Amino acid sequence: MEARTTARVDRPAGVVLALFALYFIWGSTYLGIRFALDGFPPLLMSGARFVCAGGVLYALLRARGAPKPAPREWGASALVGTLLVCGNALVVVAEQWVSSGVAAVAIASMPIWAVIIAGLWGRWPAKLEWVGLAVGLCGVLLLQGRGDLRASPAGTVALFFSTLSWALGSVWSKRLPLPHGPVASACEMLCGGAVILVAAVIHGERFAAVPGPRALVSFAYLVVFGSMVAYSAYAYLLRTVKPSLATSYAYVNPVVAVGLGALLGGESFAFASIGALGLILAGVGIVAAQRGG
């Protein structure tokens, strides 16, 4: 009886810690990316981040007895990982021209695109889900119309394809034979990061100088906390709580990113942009509620 009681106490504590990691760590990575860009080329930084995180996590999991993925599972991980890591890399590219807060607000529309893409596999939105899609898209249009994105066409294009790539990878991950548990995240990060590193070399990216202390600390933070810790927390939540709770980070990350950008990054955020954030999150919330977890 005592063991059962302890398990019941430990599980909620673990869920709270995992949610904290997703809400605040992933929300803070937008500002971390901006700081890391002071010393790292965008694609090199993204690729190295995920190769380092995936390699260390994979080695730790294998040392603890996790099974070696089959070739078929590696292939699925390469496809999903490329889409997800490419989505993240495009955020890094976009943050060369837009603020971390604006990038986070734009990326908050990702679940909306995921619902649309899921319709291609036959799961079209219900009536209220269409309402959520319309509300969320109005938020994106408001953000664009105010000029936060319009002032940077390159940043707008990068963020648009970032949301599509991440959404496609998320939807596809449910239909492919990925490895079991956290090993899937490690394999995805390894494969996706390697693809981005190749793209960086082809693009001719080079270090103009040795990265400064702030850029190095930010990069280390992205590797350890943004990738290893947060991805592990996400995998834990997917195993223990409803998907609607596990993916609720999409509602909180933009708020954290906007706040940190204003407090620590000296970024400004207009009232109209806050309205856009509210519309996007309302739309995502309606869709999530209709999906019923």
Where are these regions (language model features)?
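Glycine-/small-residue-enriched transmembrane alpha-helix faces in small-molecule transporters
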Residues: 2-47, 82, 90-93, 147-175, ...
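C-terminal-most transmembrane helix of multi-pass membrane proteins
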Residues: 2-9, 50, 215-217, 251-293
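Juxtamembrane helix-entry segments on the extracytoplasmic side of multipass membrane proteins
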Residues: 11-16, 38-47, 69-75, 130, ...
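Specific transmembrane alpha-helical segments of multi-pass solute transporters/efflux pumps
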Residues: 25, 29-33, 58-107, 140-142, ...
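Helix-helix packing/entry segments at the starts of transmembrane helices
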Residues: 46-48, 103-109, 172-194, 223, ...
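Transmembrane alpha-helical segments that form core, pore/gating elements
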Residues: 54-57, 113-116, 120, 133, ...
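C-terminal transmembrane-helix exit sites in multi-pass transporters
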Residues: 56-68, 110-131, 255-274
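Hydrophobic transmembrane alpha-helices of multi-pass small-molecule transport proteins
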Residues: 57, 78, 84, 109, ...
